[in-house]
């Protein structure tokens, strides 16, 4: 579970909710496009770890995918099932889902989760757990904010200065290095590939979001794939 969010922060005072929503929907479309193009699986069993209120059904739609939503807060998992956004709910924390048997999923999804986990401890247990839970040929899918993007770098500076709550409302938004995450996935026995989801930022005016977002089509290009504001890691267990 992430830390308590403080709505009275600098960035939210300056941001228009409609602007935030526009980029959120644009980002979801881009996530869906990337996963459809690169996952290489048409359906199966999927686990959304740290599902929160949005377990990622837009990425893993019915009827092709059976989606299990797991969260340390059981109410969030129940909410996902009640809304039809998941087929089953499970209480449990990332890296501690020992109740689930080995090789029981084709996809393990961490959507905007690992950068919160990184605040509390190392990511290696989550990656090792993903490999254990995956069937041969299955994939860990992680979508995270990027330390190498200017916004991520600025956020990291604010966090180091102890200003995270004042600036963006929570201390546990920890932008991740895509290179380090890919290396950690490889060390866990997975085969990683990486794509930039979007170069844009939800706090920008909508017109600027569109202009910067035009670069997203280059998000799988060598070199540029490392520099998105958010990135997608697809890390496969060998078949």
Segments from the language model and where they lie:
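Class I SAM-dependent methyltransferase SAM/SAH-binding core
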Residues: 47-48, 52-97
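A short acidic, Gly/Pro-enriched loop at the edge of an enzyme's catalytic core
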Residues: 95-108
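A short glycine-rich, Lys/Arg-flanked "PGG" loop and its adjoining helix->strand segment in the class I
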Residues: 124-136
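Acceptor-substrate binding/catalytic loop of class I
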Residues: 164-180
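Conserved class I S-adenosyl-L-methionine
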Residues: 1-41, 141-163
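A C-terminal cap/extension of S-adenosyl-L-methionine-dependent methyltransferases
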Residues: 159, 192-239
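A short beta-strand submotif of the Rossmann-like class I SAM-dependent methyltransferase core
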Residues: 110-114
């Amino acid at each position: 579970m992430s830390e308590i969010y403080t709505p009275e922060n600098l960035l939210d005072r300056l941001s228009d909710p409609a602007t935030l929503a526009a980029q959120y929907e644009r980002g979801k479309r881009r996530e869906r496009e990337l996963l459809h193009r690169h996952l290489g699986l048409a359906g199966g069993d999927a686990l959304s770890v740290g599902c929160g209120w949005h377990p990622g059904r837009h990425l893993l739609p019915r009827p092709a995918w059976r989606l299990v939503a797991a969260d340390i807060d059981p109410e969030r998992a129940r909410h996902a099932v009640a809304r039809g956004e998941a087929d089953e709910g499970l209480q449990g924390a990332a890296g501690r889902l020992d109740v689930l048997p080995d090789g029981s999923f084709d996809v393990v999804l961490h959507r905007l989760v690992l950068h919160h986990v990184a605040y509390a401890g190392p990511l290696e247990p989550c990656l090792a757990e993903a490999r254990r839970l995956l069937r041969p040929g299955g994939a860990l899918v992680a979508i995270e904010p990027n330390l190498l993007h200017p916004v991520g770098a600025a956020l990291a500076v604010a966090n180091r200065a102890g200003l995270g709550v004042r600036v963006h409302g929570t201390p546990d938004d920890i932008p991740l290095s895509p290179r380090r995450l890919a290396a950690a996935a490889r060390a866990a026995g997975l085969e990683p590939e990486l794509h930039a989801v979007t170069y844009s930022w939800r706090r920008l005016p909508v017109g600027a979001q569109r202009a910067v977002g035009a670069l997203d089509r280059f998000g799988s290009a060598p070199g540029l794939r490392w520099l998105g504001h958010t990135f997608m890691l697809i890390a496969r267990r060998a078949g």
